[in-house]
Structures are given as C-alpha cells and as structure tokens.
Design a protein with these regions (language model features):
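NAD(P)+-binding Rossmann beta1-loop-alpha1 motif at the extreme N-terminus of oxidoreductases
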Residues: 2-66, 70-73, 79, 101-105, ...
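Rossmann-fold dinucleotide-binding core
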Residues: 11, 91-95, 109, 115-227, ...
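Glycine/threonine-rich flexible loop motifs
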Residues: 82-97
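Interdomain hinge/lid region at the active-site interface
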Residues: 191, 216, 221-224, 228, ...
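Small-residue-rich helix-loop
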Residues: 232, 355-388
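C-terminal amphipathic alpha-helical interaction region
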Residues: 409, 417-493
C-alpha cells in the first residue's frame, strides 16, 4: 500500500444537487470511500455539504468538505474527481480552481451533459498540464444515479483502468449481468454518444406521444384503455423504459381524483441536447429528420398562444368514421415500432459517421449493449441492434440488416395506413410521417435531387454529375446562353 494514500478516500465528487448526491450514495453503497465538495454561495448555496453528510449520507463512508484544497488532499493518488455541475462555463471555472491542487496523473471526470466539443478542448487542456480528463455521459436520471445508470466515458484512455472499477460498479447491469458502462473512445466521444442517446430519446418520446394522441382522438379510447394497450406492448418487442412509464401515466390521478395527464398543459420543454444532436448531424452531412422533427415539435408546442389563435382560423374537420379499434391499434403499433427503428437507425448512422470523421473507432454493438440498462432509451430491441452490428457482414445501414429488413417489411402496411388515415382526419403525426418519408427516400434508387442540382448550377454554377459519365466528373451548363462557363468555387447555397 502507498503510505501516502493511507486513510485517503477512493474518489471525490463535486456538486451536490440531486444527481451528485445520488451518485455519491451509489458509490458508497458499492463499498467506495467518497469525498464530497460543494461550493458555498452566501444566500444561495449554504450548508449544502453539512446537510448531505448529516442527512442522506449519515452513517455512510462519505466525507464532506467545504474547502477545495482539503477536499483534493483527502483523495488517494492518482486522484479521481467526478464533477457534477452545470454544463458550460461552470465546468471550466471549476477546473481552473482544481488545477493548482492536483498532482500529475490525476483524473477529472465530467459527468454532466457537456457539449462534446467542450470535452475535446478540456481533454487537450488537462493532458497538456499533465492531468487526465474523462467526459462521461450519464443517463438514467435521479433513479439511475442512485441505483445504476448507463455511463458513457471517453477521453484520456490511460484513465480507463483507473476509473473502470468505480464507474462499472455504479452502472446499471443488463439482463445478462454486463455493466452498462464501457470505454467509448478518445476526446469528446463519450459526450457525443450521450448527445445522440438524448436525440433518440427526443424521437422516442415524440413517437409515443403521437401513438397516445391517435388512440385518444381517432379511436376515442379512454385513459384506462390506453394504459392497457401500452402495458401490453411492453410485454413484447416494444418493451422499454419509456413504454413502461407511459403505461402508468394515463391511470395516474391527482389529489382531486382526476386524471393528471388530462390536466397537464400541452407545452413540452427541452434543455438543448436534442438540438445539439440535430446540429451536429447536419455538420456531418447526415439525415436526422425524425429527431429534428421531435425537437421542432417541442418548439411548436411551446407556442401555445399562437396555436390557439390559429386553431380558430383553420378549423380541422374530422370525419365521423367509426374505425375497427383492434385493427387500428395494430396499425398504431406498426407505426410506432417501425418509426422507432428509423430513429435508432438514424442515430447509429450519425455515430458511425462521427467515428469515421474523428477517427474514434466507435464500437456500435458495445454502445447498443451499454444502452440496455439504466438509461432512458433502454429497450429490448437493443439486443437485436447489437447483434446486427456484430455480424460478420456488418450492414451499411441498420435497416438493411436481415432481421430489421424483415421487421420493416412486416410493419410497412400498417404504418402506411396509420399515417394516411391520420392525414385524412387532419390529425398531426409529424414524427410518424417523417420516419415514413425517410424510409421511402432511403429505399429509392432515384430521388428528385437532380432537379435541385440543376437549379444550383443554373443560378450559382455549382456544377453537377451526369448519369452518362463516370462519378467524380463535374459539369457546368450555360443554361441561358449568356452566363459564361465559369464554375462556382467554394461558394455554396
């Protein structure tokens, strides 16, 4: 034993909001000795450490500190310090406070929802100073932090053997006992993967909401009936955390005895990671339409006043048609399942493109398995996704894997019917229809993009390729007879 580490703790944690508290308790419950620190801001954050140590952490191997130097000194070398603070400048400020007290080889772990580009920069900065930095995406919310989350670490690879025992011990375990925490890759890859996870989460939630909305407005099902349908779906291929909680929500009553879901205002908030996933997909030149739709629908939902005004100007006239409820529920199932597969396929395609662009060498099968427990998008078909990516002949696209190709063929008829009927009844299903249009575009050998490129060449001399020439040769047409032969350089519209 290193005598310098005698009576030292195994890990330090900074930031005692609920996520930080729960992670510290989780670590202590797994046998680790933990030092905790929280800033003191007069009139804003006072007595945070004392309340935690004497409250929820009482009797556990958790030591509290209000002095950052004493906190750092209390941790065994090489120090492992997990930061659970608000993403952005707060992380940078905290790092600057820590640097003077660290020793060479110490490890900082950012467990917040940081932008992966910030993590890229922080890894480089820490390593330049002789330290190590891990950007670890943590999914699972308050419950996951306490009982086991999905943790996605990336950054300084030499830090992994040091932090692996602790992080894997507090991570959720999949049904086969595998920890939902594996090394992702270098730089900001861990936070990038968490960002795409959150984007898929946005898509999942929008799709489930649309399924609920069609049941309610097209079929006229009551809350109990809808809850039963979601509960039944959770016993099959749609089994997942989000379907599970959706089965509970319609039946939940408030203190007055009424159904709470019917009293919740139809405006959905967002914190930004869904938007980040869409922006980064665009920068990588990858379609992420379903998730973009989910993000934009939250934005539109927030414009409640505008929607109320518009609803009085354009009255939706729904027919009095009586639908075969059992058959229509099957169609809703098909639309939900198929669209979810599209959402995951789009997300994993972005991960693959990022892996290639940034030389991260991401293991998509490992990522799929990592999401099987603890995280918000955990679902049974992630096993099938992992299997597809582990195949000897790895598919170019998830939906082209034999298993998913067969699933999509079985689901397509009901999916099409559901979207068509919803449009006929003037019932918005933007994510279902976005997914269906993406699928049709994906399986189309030809698209109308030739017209777009002709237009670009007409007004901007952006050139085009020809179907009767080899790929890679570019041509410009003098469309008007007086435009000249000069081609566009780097100018793009």
């Amino acid at each position: 034993m290193n005598m310098k580490n005698l009576n030292k703790t195994d890990i330090g944690l900074i930031g005692l909001a609920v996520m930080g508290e729960n992670l510290a308790l989780n670590m202590a419950d797994k046998g680790w000795n933990v030092s905790v620190y929280n800033r003191t801001v007069p009139g804003v954050e006072e007595g945070v450490v004392e309340r935690f140590v004497n409250g929820r952490a009482k009797g556990k191997k958790i030591e509290g500190y209000t002095d950052i130097a004493e906190f750092v000194t209390s941790i065994a070398i090489p120090r492992k310090i997990m930061m659970m603070v608000r993403a952005g400048s707060a992380v940078d400020e905290l790092m600057e406070q820590l640097f003077p007290h660290l020793s060479e080889g110490d490890i900082l772990i950012d467990g917040g929802n940081s932008n992966y580009e910030d993590t890229n920069r922080r890894v480089a900065l820490a390593e330049k100073k002789g330290f190590r930095f891990v950007g670890a995406g943590v999914s699972g919310g308050e419950e996951g932090a306490l009982n086991g989350a999905s943790i996605m670490p990336g950054g300084s690879e030499s830090a992994w053997p040091e932090v692996k025992p602790i992080l894997q011990s507090i991570a959720a375990k999949a049904s086969d006992g595998t920890p939902c925490c594996q090394w992702i890759g270098p730089a900001g890859s861990g936070h990038f993967v968490k960002m795409i996870h959150n984007g898929i989460e946005y898509g999942d939630m929008q799709l489930i909401a649309e399924a609920y909305w069609v049941m309610k407005n097209l079929l006229g099902l009551d809350n109990g009936q809808m809850a039963e349908i979601f509960a039944d779906w959770n016993e099959g291929k749609l089994r997942s955390y989000l379907i599970e909680i959706t089965a509970n929500i319609p039946r939940h009553k408030d203190k007055s005895g009424g159904y709470l879901i019917d009293k919740i205002l139809d405006t959905a908030g967002q914190k930004g990671t869904g938007k980040w996933s869409v922006i980064n997909a665009m920068e990588l030149g990858m379609p992420l339409g379903l998730i973009a739709t989910a993000v934009f629908e939250r934005s539109l939902s927030a414009q409640k006043g505008l929607r109320e005004t518009a609803s009085k100007q354009f009255v939706c006239r729904r027919s009095q048609a009586v639908y075969n409820k059992s058959e229509m529920v099957k169609d809703i199932y098909s639309a939900l399942y198929a669209s979810k597969l599209v959402s995951y396929a789009q997300g994993f395609a972005v991960l693959q493109r990022a892996s290639d662009a940034f030389a991260w060498n991401l293991d998509l099968a490992s990522i799929a398995r990592m999401w099987r427990g603890g995280c918000i998008i955990r679902s049974i078909f992630l096993n099938d996704i992992a299997t597809a990516f582990e195949a000897k002949d790895k598919p170019k696209h998830l939906l082209l894997a034999p298993y998913f190709k067969n699933e999509m063929q079985l689901l397509l008829s009901g999916w099409k019917h559901l979207v068509a009927q919803s449009m006929k009844e003037e019932l918005p299903v933007p994510a279902f229809s976005s997914a269906l249009n993406y699928f049709y575009s994906l399986v189309s050998a030809k698209l109308p993009a030739n017209m777009i490129q002709a237009q670009r060449d007409y007004f901007g001399a952006h050139t085009f390729e020809r179907t009767d020439e080899l790929r890679g040769q570019f041509f410009h047409e003098n469309w008007t007879g007086h435009g000249g032969d000069t081609k566009s350089g780097t100018y793009n519209v």
